Amino acid sequence: MKEGYVIRNQDIPHFLTFTVVDWVDVFTRKVYRDILLDSLKFCQEHKGLVLTGYVVMSNHIHLMAQSKDGKLSDLIKDIKKFTAQKILKRIVEAGESRSDWMLKRFEFAAKSNSKNSEYQFWQVGNHPEEIFTEKFLWSKLNYIHMNPVRSGIVSKASDYLYSSASNYVGKESLLDVSLADNPIINPLKSSGFDVDIDLW
């Protein structure tokens, strides 16, 4: 990991990205998305994870996360380890149609990392960025929520089930999040906050 992208302050919120090795599109399958969300929910309820925003895409996930206990790095390690083990187990045992191809990619990636015994699911590193201003917070929330729109999956961010955009517009959602305080009534770009609120 580059020196500029490390978690120096374990107490404050960070923008994080977890990416599947070789950008393999694992999360096109609902079963794997649900494993990921179940893990996040467990960590919210039992390990002090605070989420302000998230989105699950086909091969990566963005989070705006904080640890109540000042142990963000430990939380990340737990989430990545648990989800990797459970998803890999499911791929092996459930007859996933792409299993041979995916497992070969994960096996190849593991050979370059001595910490892995057989397979590596997640890329090393999380590209952490400290959330230090309201403007930065809202720009990252906008970036997270607009991922499915930019990818052509939905036309409005809140229509995408696997993100926190629905939380911010009062719709039903899969995960509870700690909503960021909206610093202005309508955070449009002209206000200085780079948020495409009309597309949420």
Model-found features: residue ranges?
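Short catalytic/metal-binding and nucleic-acid-binding patches
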Residues: M1-W200
